[in-house]
């Protein structure tokens, strides 16, 4: 970097830092007492009438499209009817019947207090006919200049407090399967539309958007639970939790190819009291992305999780409403493009503070750590400037090389981060560590990285040391 330099070092009191750290740990994070969920009793058990081969062949949907019969031959109506008539505190259960192990559905809607349970060995498939999801005729399954809301989600959870999705089965959005258009199998998949939108965006300033459905979209719903379910191949985001208080995600699996664009795993936004724990996530975008575009996101615990391919544990890019009180602990990131990431820019920035990462292992990532306040900045409008302060990295171990960067927006809008035990387990020489418009504090744990950059300070001392190894953290994807 032109003009890059090593920072001057000044010391701070380790005791003072320890007190501040302990105080921060007592507050924030999910304020609820979160326990392992319990599957509620069934109000009705629906038996499968389809094999997996029949559900994914597309034949049922092409016949229905040609006949103009809509979703009559799908499972949409009977699942929805069961959800509508189930008492609160109970579940609609999807079960195997002989060799039949699949359900095929268009958009469905959860109801307050009602849980959808997908039994072991059962897969609930999302239909491939874009007409079923269209908000208005022709609005879904295309690339257009609209905002990206042309499709209903596969599962809508709106004003449905106390609802959930559970079970040892799977929900498959068929994002990589060819769409059904006018009674024929088309040449495009949901994921192809995302690529088409990106290609079109390279030719113009205002990029068009793919109009594709999310898998699970919640809004104005408190105390929502995802438990043990496997989510696969969403056309877009797998789980969006918006304007809610109380989200529990426990023991789920998200499994989607790394090439599937915009397939975030879990995106909490404008919400509070969130726990995501004991889960395995790999997808084509952020494994988790904490957002705060229209309001604050606060009090969140991410614990005992394993991430694989994807764009890592992210905050942003929408941070206008403020993000605070976040605790991320016992996390392994094995081969992601990015590891730990805070991203925003001057069109959508805000204050990100009181975020603690603890006991983190990252290997084989191009960018193990990136806190960037100029992320994908389009160069228009500078009235929502991002500031990151009170960020702590504790017991973070990286291996495999890559970039570690802290980039504040300017001299007045900085990144403030404490590195309390941050080690390259191989060699610091394998990493390009940079800090610009940033204030770094080292200690009391060891830090063996050497940072260069501009307009930045370091309080503390770079020292070699030891932290627990990561071998046991990296487990195969289930």
Regions found by a protein language model. Name each.
Residues 2-115, 119-227, 250-258, 418-420, ...:
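Extracellular "leader-to-stem" segments immediately downstream of a signal peptide or signal-anchor
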Residues 26, 101-105, 111, 284, ...:
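Flexible loop/turn segments at secondary-structure boundaries
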Residues 339-478:
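Extracellular beta-rich repeat passengers
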Residues 98, 243-245, 253, 292-294, ...:
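Active-site-proximal loop/turn and secondary-structure-junction residues that shape catalytic pockets
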Residues 90, 105, 127-129, 174-178, ...:
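Short glycine/acidic-rich loop motifs that flank beta-strands on beta-rich extracellular proteins
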Residues 120-121, 161-170, 222-232, 245-257, ...:
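Right-handed parallel beta-helix
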Residues 79-85, 102-112, 237-243, 277-279, ...:
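Short, T/G/N/S-enriched strand-turn elements that build extracellular solenoid repeat scaffolds
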